[in-house]
Each structure stands twice: as structure tokens, then as C-alpha cells.
Curated annotation (Swiss-Prot):
Keywords: Cell cycle, Cell division, Septation
Listed name of the protein: Probable septum site-determining protein MinC
Assembly description: Interacts with MinD and FtsZ.
Gene3D superfamilies: 2.160.20.70, 3.30.70.260
Function field: Cell division inhibitor that blocks the formation of polar Z ring septums. Rapidly oscillates between the poles of the cell to destabilize FtsZ filaments that have formed before they mature into polar Z rings. Prevents FtsZ polymerization.
Name of the encoding gene: minC
Amino acid sequence: MVERDNELKGTTFTISVLHISDGKPERIRQLLAAKVAQAPQFFNCAPLVINVERLADIPDFDQLKGLVESEDFVLVGITGARDEAMKTAAKAAGLAVMASGKSRKVEPLPLPEPTPSPVAEVKAAPAPLVPSKVHVGPVRSGQQLYAAGTSLVILGSVSQGAEVIADDSIHIYGALRGRAIAGAKGNTQARIYCQQLQAELLSIAGTFQLSDALPAGLIQQPVHVRLDNEQLRIDHIK
């Protein structure tokens, strides 16, 4: 068995950002509780970053951290800090200080190209096809379906409070009133299709949208959902 050295690699995660304009604990608690109520399993132990750009005063970060964790989120850091005092206070509470927006990519230094050695061409065997998981009938409230390594096809409606998950795409031949999570293991090419959109939550590869952010003109309409530039795009199916 070949031992590999420890490695530090860069990667990208989708993290919810909470924008606050005051540090009043009760208002923050109510907002988080409302989001958790919409999708309890999705937000369970979910990482959270707080944008403090609109705060005039430095909040009690220890208190804020405890409040966030009491609602089953994990506070990992802040963004939008405009002065060093706020950054120092956040670091003292064990929080990361993160830059706002997207960071500029750092180009790696060019390495000398090795002299290629003749290699015999080996044709890889095609990966075996994994058949889609098909569910006939409605998915009832409290029920969860998961299609591991494949797509999920539902010949029926998904009730409010139900959850359907697939590592690939999700096809719903009925109304979607619950939660649909496609690309559960990071497949950004996954899609969600449904004949009637009333979802509590839509998610593809970790990028999600809740019911209160759905386009009003597409409610109860047949739609196709996909990732476009790291955001969910919802199109009407004609």
C-alpha cells in the first residue's frame, strides 16, 4: 500500500451568508428559525457566514456564535468587516475573516515540462450504466427518497414536507411541493424537472433556493432547473 503525503488543496463550497443590519439576537434567531423550518434536514449543521458590512458597532461574536449554533447552524466566519477592530474581535471568537465576493485566481508558477516517455495506449472500459431509480406514486410528507449514483424519476407528486434526493438529475411527473436536491454529491450538470413548481427548496450541487425566492410567474408551472454561473436558473417548459 502506497502512503500519500498530507496535502493542502483549494476547493469551493457553497455557504449561506446571513446579512445583518443590527446585532439584536432575537431578530437573528427568528430569521434562522424560519429558514430551518422550511428545510430542516438541509440546514442541519449547515455552515454559515455572517456579513457584518451594515453593522455600525462591533457585536458580541461569542454570543452571536452561540445563538447561531442553537439554531443548528455552524458559524464559520464573517465577511464585510471594514475595520481591524472588528476583524480582531471576530478572530478572538475563533471565527474566520473572509473576503467579500469572489477572489482573484492565483496563477501557478510554470513548471518545466517533463520529457514524455512512450506509453502504450490503453483503452478504458466504458463505465457501467446505472439505471435510474423510478418511484411510482406520490411521495408523502415526511418521506425521503434517495437515488445513489443515478437519476430519480417520480411518477407522481412530491408532497409538502417530503424530500427527494439524487446524485444525478430529478424528474417529477407531477407537482413538486416538497424539497428536491439534485447533484447531491457535487454533480453540477444535474437538473431538476417538474410539471408544477411549488417547491419548499430546490438544490443542485449545494446551490439552493427556498420557496420565498422562487419567481412568482413560475409558481405552479412546468419548469426546468439548472446551474448557470453558480446560480440556479429556473426556466418555463413550454
